[in-house]
């Protein structure tokens, strides 16, 4: 188990931090450490609820890169996010909720290209896309 944890810490860029206290880590490092703790449990599905909401922009990238790696490794995830470019790049499905009810459930290209509901159209308009990002264009 310890070998696996050390390998995962290395994979998310936290080598040498295995003995650090939470107060010694940045927000992004804390999020990545939490992801490593979850991965050590070998879950069938990982749930992320606004995992980047309280982070500074430079920390957001760190966390999204880890989630991108998980997506590339075909990890099953349910991600609640307002990071629309990222969602478009990594999602197999997009589900738009309003007051706890599903308003749209479709693939990313259809959701971003031809939203069905007025709610989705207004939601996407609020992001003012200037171009269509390519898969993984958001995270370098």
Name what the model sees in each region.
Residues 46-49:
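Catalytic Walker B motif of ABC-type/P-loop ATPase nucleotide-binding domains
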Residues 61-73:
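Helical segment within the ABC ATPase nucleotide-binding domain
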Residues 81-82:
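H-loop/switch region of ABC-family ATPase nucleotide-binding domains
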Residues 87-89:
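A short, surface-exposed alpha-helical micro-motif characterized by mixed small hydrophobic
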Residues 109-140:
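C-terminal boundary and immediately downstream tail of ABC-type ATPase nucleotide-binding domains
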């Amino acid at each position: 188990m310890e070998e696996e944890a050390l390998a995962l810490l290395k994979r998310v860029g936290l080598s040498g931090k295995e003995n650090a206290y939470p107060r010694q880590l940045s927000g992004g490092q804390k999020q990545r450490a939490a992801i490593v703790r979850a991965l050590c449990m070998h879950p069938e599905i990982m749930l992320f609820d606004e995992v980047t909401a309280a982070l500074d922009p430079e920390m957001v990238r760190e966390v999204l890169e880890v989630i991108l790696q998980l997506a590339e490794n075909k990890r099953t995830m349910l991600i609640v996010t307002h990071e629309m470019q990222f969602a478009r790049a990594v999602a197999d499905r997009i589900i738009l909720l309003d007051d706890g009810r599903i308003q749209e459930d479709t693939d990313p290209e259809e959701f971003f290209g031809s939203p069905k509901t007025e709610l989705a159209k207004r939601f996407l308009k609020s992001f003012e896309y200037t171009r269509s990002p390519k898969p993984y264009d958001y995270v370098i």
